[in-house]
């Protein structure tokens, strides 16, 4: 899949590059990281943050959000045209946390968007550096994927909450470009398409006129992105049907939900990249490390090495467990919300627990939370091994899975069998095999029935010691199969609310 001539690598998507060789890609990704780091250093100076305050992940999130908001042209235009009380469309800001008299204080800051844009461009040699902005969006998206379970969003579009392993990138903004499209899960794409079709059903003019033409081309583009994620001919043929439909309606919604379900067993190709918070890149750049010169990759050892040598802190609420908070952020850093927990435990070198067993809420602190009782602690983001990120769904096989999440979407290219609960998945495929997609549906169901438990994915791939930078000695892990593999197992994670 990944080697097809027409596909561009992540790094090329990430840097809007033409075809580049590996060294050029590493350099352009490094340049992007340098820019984020320089911007972060400058913002810390502007805000007079101490070294410790600058390494606080909550401050990092606020600063990242400010620059994303400053460059959100569509929203900025909307705010200009629809002024709302108490919101200045030209300003952006958020909470900054400072240590005052041995206590954490919250300070709300406000900056001109124009000023933030100037600082960002200056840090990026005068460019808009969209790649760096997208990188931060993907980090926020990965953090959301790890923190929240999108049950309500799934139910609203007629899907099943147990399909949460397909929802990677579901909170990414539309403007996240090719790099954003690459990391979106099958369920996310299906959900976007269903929302679009529903609007068309409810609004007669949605597909008509000058705007309708734009809408239609957006619809077809999204269909093609989703089609490109599927690995079997029958799934792709069904996507062609959905794309070519004259007047998309309930039949297409049915087909899309069918395809989403099928992806629990016949998994789609979804890219994974380790996107770290700006407060990791800042101090590294400040210490004199030259990412552009040294080169950097989001899918290799580099993020692991960087995290081995980084100090990041987080605010901790009174009844939260700092180790659990660390796990949450570690998983987000490696885009691993839907990976098999047994593999994650092996790579991290400490047990990785399901979301429902973690005593921690999200990383962000709401404006009404009491600061008097806030402590802070170091996030443990180091790992025992490293592994190469995958952009394929791996092949498929079967194993006992859980009430909550019934499949995984692999993050790391490491040999194992991929758990999914075949009986639960297949139970959803009763009945409807008539209609124009019947032969494709039958073919897809047959492939799912044939998926074998013993089949191994990523055969021969292993994890590597952190000293093994060239990935010469793969260590193939062995797993205790009696353990639970799903992160959102019978889960009670909070809902994501915009």
Curated annotation (Swiss-Prot):
UniProt motif (Bipartite nuclear localization signal) ranges: 198-216
Record's comment on post-translational modification: Late in virus-infected cells, may be cleaved from a 56-kDa protein to a 53-kDa protein by a cellular caspase. This cleavage might be a marker for the onset of apoptosis in infected cells or have a specific function in virus host interaction.
Pfam families the UniProt entry points to: Flu_NP
Annotated region (Disordered), positions in chain: 1-21
Principal subcellular localization: virion
Subcellular location: Virion; Host nucleus
Biased composition, class Basic and acidic residues, residue ranges: 8-21
CC per GO annotation: helical viral capsid; host cell; host cell nucleus; ribonucleoprotein complex; viral nucleocapsid
Protein name as it appears in the record: Nucleoprotein
Organism: Influenza A virus (strain A/Kiev/59/1979 H1N1)
Lineage of the organism: Viruses, Riboviria, Orthornavirae, Negarnaviricota, Polyploviricotina
Gene: NP
